[in-house]
Design a protein with these regions (language model features):
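Short Gly/Pro-enriched turn/cap motifs at secondary-structure boundaries
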Residues: 105-108, 184-185, 210
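The catalytic Nudix box helix
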Residues: 144-179, 194-196
């Protein structure tokens, strides 16, 4: 039920319960309890409000599970402000030193990640990559390039470095555009979506996976092929790509996937396709 606080604040309280330390035998065994997977949760979310509530709940419950004692003195901690912050219960904790501009409180951390769609100048080509990490049984997924920002980096320099490290493609700092961001608290990331534009000159666009061998493959895909896939896609955790596998030297028996509408990679590819269609 809605409540009002101090006459000007109102809303509906929402609580998250963490079952991470429970086993299945602890759960109520009836038809109203459904065991969810990471994918099924995303498939069941109906709008951005639900997705936001779920992501907040997941982040805070994971954070509260991860920290039990003060990282400075080892004393027990207490979660306050609805679980959005913890304080050390020891009054003489070294963290509580106002002269050093320190206090005995801590907040959830956020790790920024740059997600980059690499395109040529006229938007007709988009480089997508396949990770060595297993996505799931029988799933072959190509996506945009991604990597964590390092301390002291700008978003643009991080994007430039990640593109070169993973694909060998040489993109100039000035040719990186920040498009949008997306919270991704799995466990604690902020996805920063970028477009890296490459001038094809016989050298810049050459793919080399040997600088930091994280990828199994990376290829320049025709944007028109991606557009055909987007045109028939409705929803889901993954987007099936309607590709001519022979054209890209892929196993003719496999179905290639792209991250679905829940991921910023999908938004970036959609952005690329829209820009391409505006030019033709």
């Amino acid at each position: 039920k809605d409540f009002i606080y101090k006459e000007q604040y109102s809303g509906t309280p929402i609580f998250a319960i963490n079952f991470a330390d429970k086993v299945e035998t602890d759960y109520i065994q009836n038809d109203s309890v459904t065991k969810l997977t990471f994918q099924s949760v995303f498939n069941d979310l109906t709008d951005n409000m639900e997705a936001s509530l779920y992501s907040h709940a997941r982040m805070y419950t994971q954070w509260s599970t991860k920290f039990k004692r003060c990282v400075e003195c080892g004393e027990e901690i207490q979660f306050i402000h609805g679980g959005s912050k913890w304080v050390c219960t020891r009054s003489q904790c070294p963290l509580a030193d106002p002269l050093q501009h320190r206090n005995n409180a801590a907040y959830p951390r956020t790790d920024p990640v740059v997600i980059t769609a690499i395109v040529n100048r006229d938007w007709s080509k988009c480089c997508l990559a396949r990770s060595k990490r297993s996505i799931g049984k029988g799933i072959i997924m190509y996506s945009t390039v991604a990597g964590f920002m390092e301390p002291g980096e700008t978003i643009e320099s991080s994007c430039q470095r990640e593109v070169w490290e993973e694909t060998g493609i040489d993109v100039k700092y000035k040719d990186i555009t920040i498009v949008k961001s997306q919270p991704w608290p799995y466990p604690q990331n902020l996805m920063i979506g970028c477009i890296a534009t490459v001038d094809f000159n016989g050298q810049n666009e050459i793919i080399d996976l040997n600088h930091d061998p994280e990828l199994l493959d990376a290829q320049w895909f025709d944007t028109r092929d991606l557009s055909n896939s987007l045109a028939t896609y409705e929803s889901g955790f993954l987007l099936p790509l309607k590709l001519d596998n022979a054209k890209y030297s892929l196993d003719p028996e496999i179905t290639v996937q792209l991250p679905g509408k829940n991921a910023i990679a999908y938004d970036l590819v959609t952005y690329v396709v829209k820009k391409f269609e505006e030019t033709v």
